[in-house]
Amino acid sequence: MHLEVIVQSYKKSKYYFSHTFYLYKFIVVNSPDMLHISQLGLFLGLFAIVMHSANLIKYTSDPLEAFKTVNRHNWSDEQREHFYDLRNLYTSFCQTNLSLDCFTQILTNVFSWDIRDSQCKSAVNLSPLQNLPRTETKIVLSSTAANKSIIASSFSLFYLLFATLSTYTADPPCVELLPFKILGAQLFDIKLTEESLRMAMSKFSNSNLTRSLTSFTSEIFFNYTSFVYFLLYNTTSCVPSNDQYFKQSPKPINVTTSFGRTIVNFDSILTTTPSSTSASLTSPHIPSTNIPTPEPPPVTKNSTKLHTDTIKVTPNTPTITTQTTESIKKIVKRSDFPRPMYTPTDIPTLTIRLNATIKTEQNTENPKSPPKPTNFENTTIRIPKTFESATVTTNATQKIESTTFTTIGIKEINGNTYSSPKNSIYLKSKSQQSTTKFTDAEHTTPILKFTTWQNTARTYMSHNTEVQNMTDRFQRTTLKSSNELPTIQTLSVTPKQKLPSNVTAKTEVHITNNALPSSNSSYSITEVTKEVKHTRMSASTHEEINHTEIAQITPILNAHTSEKSTTPQRSFTAETFLTTSSKPAILTWSNLLSTTPKEPLTNTSLRWTDHITTQLTTSNRTQSAKLTKANISSQTTNIYPQTITGRSTEV
């Protein structure tokens, strides 16, 4: 018998932790005969020597055979006994709201990640991977067949623990219950010292888990994993992590490991898996789900019998101490292919001020700015003295503060249908280099931000919703068509800080999308007419008891389109109320198209309309704004995969 322990460790100075911890993942490989001893290797080596001396470790070619189906009821009585023993040890140190079914899947999914060509489809934040101290330990065990070894890698198992919590095959109730943030917080504070190692080894040697180290392949792998998880959580202090580890990270990248590829969202502090019934994710708490009560666990030696399926605990809620930033939330849905998420930096912000005139201007210095549409530019609207605005011109490369209120949607439509990066609609605002702010007398920073995102993460649409019919006009629309459906639209209404007690905001969204996604549609004829609509809006001021009448002349764009075929439609109307809470309110809707084009779109047109109405109410006045968008593309031949460009105007 030969033993080789190689310990390699280093720390990145920029991301130095106050303590070093070690995580383990075991793999059988070939290795020469050598012997190097360290504190960590000594304990692992002694453990391996004892197991090998007792002829408890054997190598087989198919270690995954017994765990290809996640069903603990198919296990033997001994396996089931060890499972409950492990779970009791797990919960005795760090109680988490984790059901038996979820815990079973976590353990059994560990084995599936070494299958060839497997791909991680994780929705868990993996950004700490880039900041970890790396440690690799190698233990060589000789057998009659060949020299085999076990590799323990801190990097590998840290990734493994995150990846197994959100596997593609996990049941939705399990995915919704997994305590992502709690587990991530624990992993930052693992104190694997010599004393804790000795305690863990002692508890493990006295546990019923050791009796499962038999010659059966399934039990070998089951208990290797059991020991790893037991060692991990037995030495965890259960102290929440500090969010500073997330702040100085690079942009989203693809991470390739021995378990496959995944997207690492470094900017996502509160990455959350959306519920199957709601896309509104404003609460940091773990959703509650009713799970059937499992069978009673058997009585095991040196363990406590569990009487309930779940153990309730208050989740750790990360806090952000910046003055102008609320929690960043990104709704991420697993996809069939890895892709980065794009965040624009040219979204204007809103503020409210006193005593001036609202005016929207175009940045004429932008050489890429499209020509001005007639009768729609340089519109100035007079409003009462209690409001004013300021337009600030910024450089194209300057990051506007409103980008911290980004809500991104990536969502599968049905089954295995996902949006493709080729299927994109790009909407560029005419004031993409300008910022219009509105603040009230009590604040110096914007208090409201309205942003609409359309289609995939590579596609976005920003509405600068203002009071008194101040509309953000999109001058140029680029339509790209493919054989896949668009996915999602999200409206985010986010306060920068708590609104005054006398201020409430109500936003109503109505979406109607029309399309001709079939090559059978031979033509589309569109007639556009303009009319002038006179409206009168009233608003009270601080200085007057009576209402001040304000005459408005609003151009209306009427579009009448006739097609040869039937146009599928999807409509959605929703309201959201924003009061004194500082949390964002999110509306999400999908099903923009009802069918999938089977071939390139030929002689067809894509058109869609939507409007957003926002009403801001204070104790003494109410201001409303309605944003209407109408886009009509001309008749086009064979637009796939080419690009068509149309003009659009909001009124």
Curated annotation (Swiss-Prot):
The keyword Glycoprotein applies. GO terms for cellular component: host cell plasma membrane; membrane; virion component. Keywords: Glycoprotein, Host cell membrane, Host membrane, Membrane, Signal, Virion. Transmembrane segments: none annotated. InterPro entries: Roseolovirus_U47. Residues 275-303 are annotated as: Disordered. Coiled coil: none annotated. Pfam families: Herpes_U47. Glycans are attached at residues 74, 97, 147, 208, 223, 234, 254, 302, 355, 378, 395, 469, 502, 520, 546, 603, 620, 631. Residues 1-56 form the signal peptide. Residues 275-292 have a biased composition (Low complexity). Belongs to the herpesviridae U47 family. This is 120 kDa Glycoprotein O. It comes from Human herpesvirus 6A (strain GS) (HHV-6 variant A).
